[in-house]
From Swiss-Prot:
The keyword Iron does not apply. Converts heme B (protoheme IX) to heme O by substitution of the vinyl group on carbon 2 of heme B porphyrin ring with a hydroxyethyl farnesyl side group. It comes from the Bacteria. Its EC number is 2.5.1.141. It comes from Microcystis aeruginosa (strain NIES-843 / IAM M-2473). Pathway: Porphyrin-containing compound metabolism; heme O biosynthesis; heme O from protoheme: step 1/1. It holds the Pfam family UbiA. Belongs to the UbiA prenyltransferase family. Protoheme IX farnesyltransferase subfamily. The gene is ctaB. This is Protoheme IX farnesyltransferase. Keywords: Cell inner membrane, Cell membrane, Heme biosynthesis, Membrane, Transferase, Transmembrane, Transmembrane helix.
Length: 316
């Protein structure tokens, strides 16, 4: 898009930049970054280099932005149909698909270069794998054709902790794969709660989301089952892996209890969109606080504090 063409839909170049920024769906990215950071802190036992953390999160941001931009290009037809998404940069005509593609390729190239030259090759490979899986498997093969679209496609959003772990250690082990699995199992309750809220939008464009195909009752049942699996699964980081300790354990217990309570409430009231909205919002908070607890638990000062408190009780 030339400057003249861009300004047909914008008053100034700041608005052009804003349109390209909106292509990246920036509200999605912070959650991906906090899962990356949590893996890095656990891998380094709370002593990750600030520079390495910054470079890895920057590379992850660029990769996620590239993936979301490519998604906007691919889904421009359904985005144009749905009232909720009609004002996005491509369907509204503010950004041309070809220029969005160039933008996405530049972002992906910068991400790969940053990882390979300043972090390591494995983390770069994993980041690019995430983009490829998101576009080829989820967006192209599954989203419009399978009721299991976000179940299988959720693997793309589960890759960030693998990237974070690889950035610190240069390899992968059981712990990062458990982190991957936690996010993978968390994704269906999170996304199906959203799908319950906007079921009509998906139905309008023939996207076979669970609520559209199976209905609200079946969806709420599946949400409950996945929540029932993911909450106890989070405790594998404590036993047998011993990757996290008391602080994380308490947080996982409390956060998990609330998650289960909200999922059960939705199961009892599957047609209540306010309850679905409450669960959707909480699922985001759940993952962010769970990862924050991982970070706090991994810090050396946390271990020292717990040891000090334990010694005081033992002396008394």
């Amino acid at each position: 898009m030339t400057g003249t063409q861009a300004l047909r839909h914008h008053d100034n170049f700041l608005q052009v930049a804003k349109s390209y920024y909106q292509l990246t769906k920036p509200r999605i990215i912070p959650l991906l970054l906090i899962t990356t950071a949590a893996a890095m802190e656990i891998a380094s036992k709370g002593q990750v280099s600030p520079l390495l953390l910054f470079l890895t999160l920057l590379g992850g941001t660029l990769a996620a932005a590239a993936a979301q931009t490519l998604n906007c290009i691919y889904d421009r037809d359904i985005d144009h149909t749905m009232l909720r998404t009609r004002a996005r940069p491509i369907p509204s005509g503010r950004v041309q698909p070809l220029h969005a593609l160039i933008f996405a390729l530049v972002l992906a190239s910068l991400s790969l270069a940053l990882f390979v030259f300043f972090v390591n090759t494995l983390s770069g490979f994993l980041a690019m794998t995430g983009i490829a899986f998101y576009m080829l498997i989820y967006t192209h093969l599954l989203k419009r054709h399978s009721i299991q679209n976000i179940v299988i496609g959720g693997a793309a959003g589960s890759i960030p902790p693998l990237v974070g772990w690889a950035a610190v250690t240069g390899d992968l082990g059981w712990i990062p794969w458990i982190l991957f699995a936690i996010i993978f199992l968390w994704t269906p309750p999170h996304f199906w709660a959203l799908a319950l809220m906007i079921k009509d939008d998906y139905a309008e464009v023939d996207i076979p989301m669970m609520p559209v195909v199976k209905g609200e009752e079946a969806t709420s049942e599946q949400i409950w089952l996945y929540t029932l699996i993911v909450v106890p699964f989070t405790f594998l980081l404590i036993y047998p892996l011993a990757a996290c300790g008391v602080v994380y354990g308490v947080a996982a217990l409390v956060l998990g209890f609330v998650f289960l309570k909200k999922a059960w409430r939705l199961k009892q009231n599957p047609f209540d969109r306010d309850i679905a909205r409450s669960l959707f919002k909480y699922s985001i908070l759940y993952m962010m606080l769970l990862c924050t607890a991982m970070v706090i638990d991994s810090l050396p000062m946390t271990s020292h504090l717990i040891a000090t408190i334990a010694s005081l009780f033992s002396c008394s």
